[in-house]
Amino acid sequence: MADQKKPLQGGATLPLMAMAALGVVFGDIGTSPLYTLSACLSAMSLQPTAVNLQGILSLIFWTLVLVVSVKYAWVIMRASNQGEGGAMALTALASHATGHSNRLRWWILSIGLLGAALFYGDGVITPAISVLSAIEGMEVASPAWKPLVIPLALGVIIGLFMVQRRGTAAISHLFGPSMLVWFLLLFGSGLTWIVADPQVLIALNPWYALQFFGIHGIGGLVILGAVVLAVTGAEALYADMGHFGARPIRMAWYFLVLPALALNYLGQGALLELDPSAIQNPFFMLFPAWATIPMVVISGIATVIASQSVISGAYSATRQALLLGYLPRQAIIHTSASERGQIYLPLLNWLLMVAVIVVILWFRSSNALSFAYGTAVTGTMLMTTILVFFVARHSWKWSLWKAGLFCGFFVLLDGVFFGANLLKFVEGGWFPLAIGLAVFTTMSTWRWGRGILASKLYPDTLSVEDFLSSVTPGDPIRVPGTAVYLTMREKAIPHALLHNLKHNKVLHERVVILTIKFEEEPRVLPANRVVVLDYGQGVRRLTARYGFMEHPDIPEILKSAENSDNLWNPLDTTYFVSRQRVIPTAKASLSLWREHLFAIMLRISANATDFFRLPPNLVMELGDVVEFSHKVPDAPKKEKTTQQ
């Protein structure tokens, strides 16, 4: 149950790593004070009376404590998959923990995919609501700025996505110090107003949270849909664990972020108790009038950093999903020579940009967007809690009552938050759910489609031994050089090899059948990377294993498999790859529209040449046309994921 701690890189001290984590992990949750309290009051059209404020502030504070401090920082961050966290890492852990039950694995996989899919709904709304809420601060300085809010927000968003291709390596070292300044401002501004009205501190008593529901009855549950805005971004504590390790993240949360957030929310409450007219924008009115524009600039920087963290998280999650075989291959561009984690996915970048622009133009204000925010976040939290139950039972060896008590409490809590957000479905809660459903459908369609495609391509597997038994010294003709054939199946003869033999009547002197397998773990030790099987007659099979945080290097694989009899010369090597095209039919187990969706995804999938970064002048691509008419079982057996 102990954490697998990531060593502090470059001799960095724990406080320095904690400060670096501020710029990556806490941007989303750190900018929540911009809009959370306003959203809570507008959710039920409440007046900022002392009783209402005490109840809301108590709910916000104890939500931060229970959801972030207890659930994520104390427990879920223990679910380390070789030091990595996140939806895919947790799904892999839960799947491994359950043993050999194929049906249970299938359900765990579905829950994990749904949780990962809902993350994209959050990823679209976070940049929109964060940037809008920061720029809306200009209205506090002068209402004349109001017509410029939308154009300025769109300009910031478009600029943010346009620079992604260049990467953030040059300025990322400034993110941590910038967010440190932000949290110190949250701390100081909140404390100033608490000193002016210390009575607000009674909201730390959980009794006032319960009293709120006593006053407002069952209708008071609506407020939870806005209260949860205070913990948006909590998943980042776990998702970014692989970058910094658990200790620096916990240190930053307990010693700076939590106190700063709590004091700022309490400070906003104190301000509203003393001046109810500040309901217009309680965050920016914490500061004197002369500081409004500087705070708009500073909050703008903080929200851009928060948005950048979400975008980078989307890149990372998508990369993991496509390497594990849940999404079509896409171009992955590394934007930093020194930081392997700094990547850029062009297609995803433009899809996200268009989606965020649509959100801003549709909702037009952070207050309206608050109705859309929350459904995806709470849905992801609920899926995470369910997966942690299996990890706690089978990996941590918790007793049934202990795992059931902990996870049961948080399933109930997450379920109440999720239900409260569903009450906002018509006002905008449908939007992130629609995005999550679309992503889940895409992932599941690709996964099932690949299974059907593999069963059609390899219905009767021809083994290498059977193939070689038909090869004689003069037939077929052996030509000089090395042929590398990429294939999905470990034991099958690649289609490209059979096509080449059928049409060209030749076989290379050296034949390498290469299968690349992506394991459900972040990394594979180099010693366990490549398995070589020599069949004789110049034919060898190489099976290379990679984790979902790694990218294959085919030349390195071939070089590692060298021996005195098989020296690899990259200049006399030809790479043979296959590319499939499917013909949808009504006979397949997928519905016809999903078959067409799979066919489209297959067409836009990056080819093996680009994905594996093979030299184009040394690649020969052969095609297969496949009719979809194969039935697959309801709960397919688990297979190692390959992407050839």
From Swiss-Prot:
It is a multi-pass membrane protein. Disulfide bonds: none annotated. Signal peptide: none annotated. It is found in: Cell inner membrane. GO terms for cellular component: plasma membrane. It catalyses: K(+)(in) + H(+)(in) = K(+)(out) + H(+)(out). The chain crosses the membrane at residues 10-30, 56-76, 106-126, 143-163, 175-195, 212-232, 252-272, 282-302, 343-363, 371-391, 403-423, 425-445. Its main location: membrane. HAMAP family: Kup. Transport of potassium into the cell. Likely operates as a K(+):H(+) symporter. This is Probable potassium transport system protein Kup. It comes from Acidithiobacillus ferrooxidans (strain ATCC 23270 / DSM 14882 / CIP 104768 / NCIMB 8455) (Ferrobacillus ferrooxidans (strain ATCC 23270)). The lineage of its organism: Bacteria, Pseudomonadati, Pseudomonadota, Acidithiobacillia, Acidithiobacillales.
